[in-house]
Amino acid sequence: MRVIASSIRKGNVIEQDGKLYVVLTAENIHPGKGTPVSQIEMRRISDGVKISERYKTTDQVERATIEDHNFTFLYEDADGFHFMNAENYDQVQVPKDVVGNVAPYLQENMVVKLSLHEMVPVAITLPQRVTLEVVETEPVTKGQTASSSYKPAMLSNGVRTGVPPHVAVGTRIVVMTEDGSYVERAKD
């Protein structure tokens, strides 16, 4: 489907020169003089190479047809990550470069959204929040509860984040999958 460059957004998949690209950032720039342009940074799906393109906002760009489906995460092995479609029980293998930096947040039986182009996974979307356990942090110090500063902590998935001073080892917390930031104590 052909669309104008100014309508491209993060997460769209573009077809260019016979290859698919996932849009990482898309910014419309309106200089004081000259023609407005769309600055688009994207990653080639086939090999992970990042490129940056600049289009006039009125240029036509080919946006690929993408289908989103819910899949359940099963396991990870040397070949990649394995998911199952809950509707028809088909299993699909997703390469590590498609999963990218969200891999530590994948948990067994987690439902994720996979974006498919001609039945090939091109992008993954995790739930916004995930519950993890603190496995390493500084001990709780009395009298620090009113402080707004965070202390470093290691989570059960191996990711480091900042947590409030009252959080101790063994506490289950909710973090954002986008950036790993602390949200709240888990309510379970």
UniProtKB/Swiss-Prot annotation:
* Listed CDD domains: S1_EF-P_repeat_1, S1_EF-P_repeat_2
Function, as annotated, reads: Involved in peptide bond synthesis. Stimulates efficient translation and peptide-bond synthesis on native or reconstituted 70S ribosomes in vitro. Probably functions indirectly by altering the affinity of the ribosome for aminoacyl-tRNA, thus increasing their reactivity as acceptors for peptidyl transferase.
Per the record, the domain of life is Bacteria
According to UniProt, the name of this protein is Elongation factor P
Gene3D superfamilies attached to this UniProt entry: 2.30.30.30, Nucleic acid-binding proteins
| A cellular component annotation (GO) from this entry | cytoplasm
Write out the pathway annotation from the protein's UniProt entry. Protein biosynthesis; polypeptide chain elongation
Compartment annotation? Cytoplasm
Q: Which organism is it from?
A: Nitrobacter hamburgensis (strain DSM 10229 / NCIMB 13809 / X14)
Q: Mind listing the UniProt keywords for this protein, alphabetically?
A: Cytoplasm, Elongation factor, Protein biosynthesis
Which NCBIfam families does its entry note?
efp (TIGR00038), PRK00529.1 (NF001810)
- SMART domains hit by this protein: EFP, Elong-fact-P_C
- Family to which the UniProt record says this protein belongs: Belongs to the elongation factor P family.
Tell me one Pfam family matched here: EFP
Q: Which GO terms describe its molecular function?
A: translation elongation factor activity
State where it is primarily located. Answer: cytoplasm
**GO terms (BP aspect):** peptide biosynthetic process
